[in-house]
Amino acid sequence: DKKPKSFLATDSYRSGMLNALRTNFRQISNVLQEGIDANGGYLVPDEYDSRLIQVLNEENVMRSLGTAVTTSGEHKINIAATKPAAAWIEEGGALTFGDATFDQIILDAHKLHVAVKVTEELLYDNAFNLENYILEQFGKALANAEEDAFINGNGTGQPLGILAETGGAQVGVTTKSSGKVTADEIIDLVYSLKRPYRKNAVFLANDACVAELRKLKDSTGQYLWQPSLQAGEPDRVLGYKVYTSAYFPLPAPGKAAVAFGDFSYYNIGDRGSRSIAELKELFAGNGMVGFVAKERVDGKLVLPEAVKLLKMASA
């Protein structure tokens, strides 16, 4: 037997949502009443949510590198705080066991709201693909806000970013100069990361910093940078892929300039479905109609030792 569809996956709910968008939520069909969100607005149809997630993954480098989980409530992750140890014993000798201890990481739900504006002419033009436009705009706005928080967030009312002083990535190398990174320091950064994490490790930095990395040469005069040989594939440094983010801070004295590690240990918790609501009368005076998308999300680096930072020396 086929599993019955969730009401969010039905064609009638999706068409009801499109009609509501086109009428600025002045016409609400009965089927849409099922999707009223407790925080205001209407839960987006499954197809919309899938397309939003696709845009989020394309636009947000941290989502493409991290691990996303869908949660219905507070999500707890148990992390082994102590590792098992092996010991040689004499024949017939007594076995000794240490007590395993666990730390607990909790993914909560922080509310993120983004708004987009549409002209009334486009809203009522049936030839205009309103769905695609709104989902693309919402997706990009949500992705930008998420990426910023997943990198720089302080954990208060927002996710905890990889650069957080507490709970973020660990400092692997501090540069000798406050304004310059050397090839040797990048090599040291790679080997500051424990071997198991190096297998899936990548670099992450601001574009301006990556421009400097491209110029670095080793002791034999060879560039560390290795251009990609395949379209769509990232370039590499020392054999490791390089990703950029506009939200990774520019190199500055006393601040992190480059992150290197296995970012799959950055866990992203999506709480439930996203919702859409109208912004009543906010733009009424200039012929614009506003919509707001809401989501609840959290993010944390569950193993800080999985990502290492190259930190600039203080001035």
Which role does the model predict for each range below?
Residues 1-105:
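Assembly-associated, polar helix/coil segments characteristic of icosahedral protein shells
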Residues 24, 296, 303-305:
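Residue-level recognition of alpha-helix termini/interfacial anchor residues
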Residues 47-50, 70-76, 154-295, 308-315:
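Extended oligomerization regions of viral-like shell subunits
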Residues 61, 83-86, 147-151, 155, ...:
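Intrinsically disordered or highly flexible coil/loop and linker segments, enriched in small
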Residues 79, 85-89, 98, 125-127, ...:
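Short helix/loop capping segments that flank catalytic or ligand/cofactor-binding pockets
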Residues 81, 120, 295-299:
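Beta-strand elements of well-folded, non-transmembrane domains
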Residues 94-191, 308-315:
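Alpha-helical scaffold segments that mediate packing/assembly in large oligomeric complexes
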Residues 100-104, 140-143, 227-231, 267-269, ...:
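Glycine-rich loops and low-complexity Gly/Arg-rich segments
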